[in-house]
Amino acid sequence: MQADMHGKLHAALEDGFFLFPFEQQQQPNIYYDTTTDQEDRPCFSFGSTISPRSWHFEKSDKIASSQLQNLVHTQPIHLINPQILFNEEFLNLENIDSQPISKETKTTKDCTMATGPERGKKSSESTRSSSLSSLFSNDESASTFHSSFNNHDNFQKSNRNGDDIDISDTIKYETNTNAQKDIKIFQENFEFNEFPYTQDFYPYTTNYTYSKPTNIHESINSKNTDSYSQYQDQFPPHTDNIHSFNNRHYSNHKSTNCNYYNNTSNNNNASDNVYEADPFIDEPQVPSYYYPLEIAFDVEKSPPPSLQKLNSKELEFLKKLNSKLSRYAAAYSFSSSNDQDYYDKVRFQEISYKFSKTYS
């Protein structure tokens, strides 16, 4: 069946054989004049009747090719369902509005009972959507193309210029794709802070302690920080910016000499502090090279639990367990089985079950 379809497709493309009965019958020796009015030339559409205006294909001055060629060369090939191309209903779309519905009605004497939805009067838009959904095997793609057609139709009716295109009109008819659903689920499951770096990097339970620098003489007391200034160089090393991490957390240590390097005699406009005041933190800024910063986290350390003395049954169980584990390890080392992950899971479940039964 599939080979026959491919054969028909190749025959239609190479020999120019027309598979659609309602397409324009061209004579082999007659060439259409380019000056002919395009409105008189029927063109392909996914609709019921041969419309002078096609919503999908642009009009061309070239010789009109077969409708199957237009279909194959303008549609993504992976979206075309080959089983629908030669469907009887799809081949007779031009008569779908005028044909009687024999399959969906039952005539009994003088009355007619309809067993399905009425199809006698259908707009071109609904017919296009039905044929479009049957043409494409992917329902989501069909709905997207149908939405694009609605958007295009509304734009044509509004008679607006090309410069007046509103982006909202394009987005309004778009369907929800799987990617949009995944993004919505991602936003629901993971709630991120809008400003992740507004707070300090470390939690508030962090302790900030000072240690004695290694280059300080032993006779100098680390508490008397003013006496340490004579051991500093005249030009201090590079100091961090006022917004850096080290300079933001000296609020509880105000005994450090911050004004040593202020030469107020030469500069009368010098500020009281070496650093400018931080507008967000009302605390003195201290050079970070005085004392290196050591960060010690407050981890709640619970006392180690008392060791439980095992009875004879538990000791026997541990011996058997160790023997099993050693046997598993030996088997893995010799066999190098590809199912090691599976046996690891089984072994973990077995150990967990036995421990839960033993220590519950």
Curated annotation (Swiss-Prot):
Residues 126-135 have a biased composition (Low complexity). This is Meiosis-inducing protein 1. Its main location: nucleus. The keyword Nucleus applies. The gene is IME1. Keywords: Activator, Meiosis, Nucleus, Repressor, Sporulation, Transcription, Transcription regulation. GO terms for cellular component: nucleus; transcription regulator complex. It is found in: Nucleus. Transcription factor required for sporulation and for early sporulation-specific genes expression. Positive regulator of SME1/IME2 expression. Directly activates expression of SLZ1 during meiosis. Residues 102-135 are annotated as: Disordered. Interacts with UME6. GO terms for biological process: meiotic cell cycle; positive regulation of transcription by RNA polymerase II; pseudohyphal growth; regulation of meiotic nuclear division; regulation of sporulation resulting in formation of a cellular spore; regulation of transcription by RNA polymerase II; sporulation; sporulation resulting in formation of a cellular spore. Induction: Starvation of yeast cells may stimulate activity of IME1 through a post-translational mechanism.
